[in-house]
Amino acid sequence: MRAIACAVSVAVVLFIFIVSPYIPTTDCIHMGKMQSMDSSGLRASSDGRIDPTQVFLNIPSTDRLRKYLEYYSSGAHVAGINRTQAEYTDAFFKAHGIDSKIVEYFPWMNYPVDQRVTLFNESTQEIKFAASLKEDVIPGDPLSEDPNNLPAFHGYSADGNVTGQLVYANYGTVDDFEALRKAGISVEGKVVLVRYGYVFRGIKVQAAEMHGARGILIYSDPADDGYGKGAAYPDGPWRAESSIQRGSVMRLQVYPGDPLTPGYASTEDAPRIDPKDAKNINHIPSIPLSYRDAEPLLRSLEGSGKLASDLGSSWVGGLTQRGVEYWTGPSELSVNILNKVEYKKTAIQNVIGRIKGSEDSEHAVIIGNHRDAWCAGASDPSSGSAALMELAYAFGELMKFGWRPRRTIILASWDAEEYGLVGSTEWVEDKIDWLRTNAIAYINVDSAVSGSSFHVESSPVFRKLLHEVTKLVTYPYSKESVYDAWLRESHANASSGDKGEDDDGSGGDSDGDEDDDKGDGSDSKTSKPKKDKPLMRPLGSGSDYTAFMAHAGVSSVSIGFGGSTGAYHSNYDSPKRLTTFIDPEMKLHQAMVRIWGLLTIKLADDPVIGLSPVSYAKEIRRYIRQLEKTSARHLNATAADRLPNKRAGAIVAGKLRHLRSAQRQLLISAHLVEHDRQHLRAIYGEDCQMKSRRRHASCLKLRDSINDRVFGMERHFIDPEGIPGREWFKHILVSPGRWLGYGSQIFPALAEAIEDGDWRRFQALAKSNVETIYEAAWFLREV
């Protein structure tokens, strides 16, 4: 790893001068014209403040974005390795008028030393196959041959050398292991081979460990993101046969961040728990494989155990096109996994920029993207890093014209996201008291561009603002608005039954019904999405919004253009692939900067914060319907040890009624906030500009009250006790699913009590959740 660190030698100051100069694009020419309008080109509102919206939309440059993308994709930038990029980011912020500093933490992380996978005859010790664990060099793509590329490796994987017969376990979900058990196939003492998809990879390792496996291999099947989807790289965007998906295998659903400092920041002198006591770490070795390396292993299973198709059609992957038959095993031959890794306390660097608010500097809108990557990481995360840099540039230009946001804007470039959201989690744990008092919202962009479809995961409170902003930005490849493209594609995906990888849909999609309800909280006849509203997914985990939303109770949203995951976490997630097949003209990147920037400006600069408690309250009604479906699905299948099933059903029905009553009160309170907002506009005006000091003071008091209630609502869904068994997660409405990892679970504590058949626990938690919702309702009524 020293070689990797030494190889990273970018001249920070020189690069700033290369990337940052004003490039004469049409956007910039427009900016030049604007300087002659009212000396700045910026309109002033009735209170004399500058309105930056239209000027901002003309700033983002595709040329600059391309340069940023090339820089952030270059050189090794695994977490804790590339301090140079942190220093560049810090210097860039400062060069554009943004106060900035590097904030270090010291988590416990692992790095690869030696990885091997062999198939052999245990009696004769004859090796039948040795996995290459290498990715091919692609002519014309220089980053595919970078000697510093990371080996096939899992972050937070266990050090170990294990041998066992091979068993194929499909996607490695808990249901898949249960299907093997029912079929009479044991994984005890075996090495398990599973496919990527449906659930987070760390859960696959955990499930294998729970069932007694000695080790696990995770491969990318071509049916999921390879030639089964289309032409493979370099002929198309989908996964090449030698492509390897790296990634973390932390138990992310238990708690993210540094394993040895759960719930508090990993400062250099912070106390650490013993690694053996870390609950978010698995204990069996794991290694990722390409489907080229997986093919001989699957062939070794043919004729052993059960035909995989006997367990379900979903058990059969895309290698059938190469003549492979999918069998469960166990194999006659043995598999050896050597995963030698080094764990150590490692310095990581977050870069935190700050634009101080002109009127309300204590309250802040936070925007963030992670900087670290397993490989080049052009889409994940460098497309987002490029967007963040262009936002910093744009804000700097606006400040040259005299603009300052009403509230503070914090720009965060996170480190160590790939290992388990480490950089952002440590910062949130470090700043938790300040965040719970002063943070208005967190806006996350991870992969800004990995495809062409606009995707949103969000707290429902953002719905109306997202609609407003996306209607202002043109979708580059059809000339409709991003909102219209989002609406069209989200409903096309819904009608085709499309489900994203690592999500079983348990969180569902938001149906966007904020405009068709009378406020009575009654259930609609259908949960199908409305035709005139785009879909939003609830937040689970898998990116840097997690600690903000699920731990601190800060309303969060994550946005990006997605669709193709065919190079995810591989050497082929390169600028060459991204600009050949996904965004040749960098216009999707430009659109993302515009959306991200407008969301930030509106939240930081509008007199009244544009978050919608009404949208949230209505969405909770749908959450309750989802919980009702969960209970119906599990009630008869789960043995109720403490109470008869009939009694359990009555308990659930009663608590659901109480939840609905609380939701109705919340909705009434949310409408009162909206009434106050309308009253402010009608009587005073949002700018509160009037000659009478008394009326001015009354206006400011009402406006501050509205804003405090609007952004404070999310905090009231935080339960200090957390979810039983994974107490770090404290949001009562959404969290990553216990057996999903990425995907969201609605009313997680209640859903897990139902799944466990623990009806007494369910009663206690439901009572607490009902009280929490009532408390949120009363908070919204405070003036």
Predicted regions and their residues:
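Metal-dependent peptidase/peptidase-like ectodomains
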Residues: Q245-G305, D360, A416-S574, T579, ...
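Alpha-helical metal-binding/catalytic segments enriched in His/Glu/Asp
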Residues: V351, I367-L421, E426, W596
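Noncatalytic luminal/extracellular "stalk/propeptide" segments of secretory-pathway proteins
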Residues: G32-V55, K67-E188, P222, P237-P256
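Extracellular/luminal Protease-associated
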Residues: P139-A278, P285, A376, D380, ...
